[in-house]
């Protein structure tokens, strides 16, 4: 029982980490788009991102 429970937790942990990685990628894409859009009006935003 314990071994099966541990393997279930491992699978859950892997799925969670994959989900976090995916959401992190999506967030960085959104941030990049916002940064590039705000660069036309805000020079300091560009210097912060680089």
UniProtKB/Swiss-Prot annotation:
Name of the molecule in the record: Nosiheptide precursor
Placement of covalent cross-link 2-(cystein-S-ylcarbonyl)-3-methyl-4-(glutam-5-yloxy)methylindole (Glu-Cys): 43-45
Lineage, opening ranks: Bacteria, Bacillati, Actinomycetota, Actinomycetes, Kitasatosporales
Cross-link (Thiazole-4-carboxylic acid (Cys-Cys)): 45-46
NCBIfam families named in the record: thiazolyl_BerA, thiopep_precurs
BP terms from Gene Ontology: defense response to Gram-negative bacterium; defense response to Gram-positive bacterium; negative regulation of translational elongation
Numbered residues of crosslink Thiazole-4-carboxylic acid (Thr-Cys): 41-42
Residue positions, PTM 4-hydroxyglutamate: 43
Record keywords: Amidation, Antibiotic, Antimicrobial, Hydroxylation, Thioether bond
Source organism, top-level taxon: Bacteria
Modified sites of kind 2,3-didehydroalanine (Ser): 49
InterPro entries: Thiopep_bacteriocin_prcur (IPR023895)
Numbered residues of crosslink Thiazole-4-carboxylic acid (Ser-Cys): 38-39, 47-48
Miscellaneous field: The mature peptide is identical to multhiomycin from S.antibioticus strain 8446CC1 (PMID 681244).
UniProt keyword annotation of Ubl conjugation present: no
Function: Inhibits bacterial protein biosynthesis by binding to ribosomes. Specifically, binds to the complex of 23S rRNA and ribosomal protein L11 (RPLK) in the 50S ribosomal subunit. While allowing a weak binding of elongation factor G (EF-G) to the ribosome and subsequent GTP-hydrolysis, probably impairs conformational changes in both the ribosome and EF-G which are necessary for translocation.
Sample GO molecular function, one term: large ribosomal subunit rRNA binding
Cross-link annotation Thiazole-4-carboxylic acid (Glu-Cys), location: 43-44
Entry comment on modification after translation: The amidation of Ser-49 is produced by the oxidative cleavage of Ser-50 rather than of a glycine, as in eukaryotes.
Family: Belongs to the thiocillin family.
3-hydroxypyridine-2,5-dicarboxylic acid (Ser-Ser) (with C-46) crosslink location in chain: 38-47
Residues carrying Serine amide: 49
Cross-link position per record: 3-hydroxypyridine-2,5-dicarboxylic acid (Ser-Cys) (with S-47): 38-46
